[in-house]
Amino acid sequence: MRQYLDLCQRIVDEGVWLENQRTGKRCLTVINADLTYNAAANEFPIITTRKSYWKAAIAEFLGYIRGYDNAADFRKLGAKTWDANANENQAWLNNPVRKGVDDMGRVYGVQGRAWRKPNGETVDQLRKIVDDLSRGIDDRGEILTFLNPGEFDLGCLRPCMYSHTFSLLGDTLYLTSYQRSCDVPLGLNFNQIQVFTFLALMAQITGKKPGQAYHKIVNAHIYEDQLDLMRDVQLKRRPFPSPRLEINPDIKTLEDLETWVTLDDFNVVGYECHEPIKYPFSV
């Protein structure tokens, strides 16, 4: 929690104002942020200086694991995070490849589970990683990437957190996640939960021990209409200790994650937080 607040304070103190063409808003911006999450000690990196809706964050990433491309499927899991980008993004609404209401296109999990090859076949990146790690194999290329520049025009949004690299040291699994852009008041709240949970889940289904998760952000920013709430409200609050994440031990395979797992299979223990803060969201 402290490293999150330190990043927020750094943006407030050192950030440079940049115009964002997509949203039409200014962003207070810093370049390069490195966060580390201790999955080995189960120190769940959830924000405590305001209420964090952790279930939606996990539900969203579960949708990525399943390769979903429709906002309705994410809503069924418990995440409404794709409603706006699928249905209110004017550039996407005008795109002739859009299939209709709630269609997201070839974004995130679609690339992770069905990356297109020139011959028309697809690559299941996640399946390969799970199979390798389960056999104790780390070929130094256990990489799940959602970033496919050749298909940017086939989706409603370029991936922000776009790549996840798994590494094995003995029987301990590590994760390094890369993010090109981060809305720190809103997006990082979700992203840090997702990085931690992804490592914990992958360790569980491959029979490994979770180690550290390393989260690398390039462009970290606070939108101009979020700044007052961050500087004058959230940064004035004292954080609470980190809670723990409990995952149903019956989750043992990738197929489990693809089929029957729901939010009922996750629980956060010992979570204390301050009152919610409603930050504006930029589409």
From Swiss-Prot:
Positions that bind (6R)-5,10-methylene-5,6,7,8-tetrahydrofolate? 183, 282
Localization, per the record, is: Cytoplasm
Top class in the EC scheme: transferase
Give the principal location in a single coarse category: cytoplasm
Q: Which residues bind dUMP?
A: 22, 180-183, 191, 221-223
Pathway listed for it is: Pyrimidine metabolism; dTTP biosynthesis
Q: Name one GO cellular component term.
A: cytosol
One GO biological process this protein is involved in is:
dTTP biosynthetic process
Keyword S-adenosyl-L-methionine attached: no
Enzyme Commission code = 2.1.1.45
> What residues form the catalytic site here?
160 (nucleophile)
What does the record give as the reaction this protein catalyses? dUMP + (6R)-5,10-methylene-5,6,7,8-tetrahydrofolate = 7,8-dihydrofolate + dTMP
Question: Which Pfam family, any one, appears in the UniProt record?
Answer: Thymidylat_synt
A GO molecular function term, named singly, is: thymidylate synthase activity
Q: Which Gene3D superfamilies match?
A: Thymidylate synthase/dCMP hydroxymethylase domain (3.30.572.10)
Q: Which UniProt keywords apply?
A: Cytoplasm, Methyltransferase, Nucleotide biosynthesis, Transferase
Subunit structure, interactors included: Homodimer.
Sorted alphabetically, which NCBIfam families does this protein's record hold? PRK01827.1-4 (NF002498), thym_sym (TIGR03284)
Task: Name the family the entry cites.
Answer: Belongs to the thymidylate synthase family. Bacterial-type ThyA subfamily.
Q: What does this protein do?
A: Catalyzes the reductive methylation of 2'-deoxyuridine-5'-monophosphate (dUMP) to 2'-deoxythymidine-5'-monophosphate (dTMP) while utilizing 5,10-methylenetetrahydrofolate (mTHF) as the methyl donor and reductant in the reaction, yielding dihydrofolate (DHF) as a by-product. This enzymatic reaction provides an intracellular de novo source of dTMP, an essential precursor for DNA biosynthesis.
Q: What is this protein called?
A: Thymidylate synthase
Source species of the chain: Actinobacillus succinogenes (strain ATCC 55618 / DSM 22257 / CCUG 43843 / 130Z)
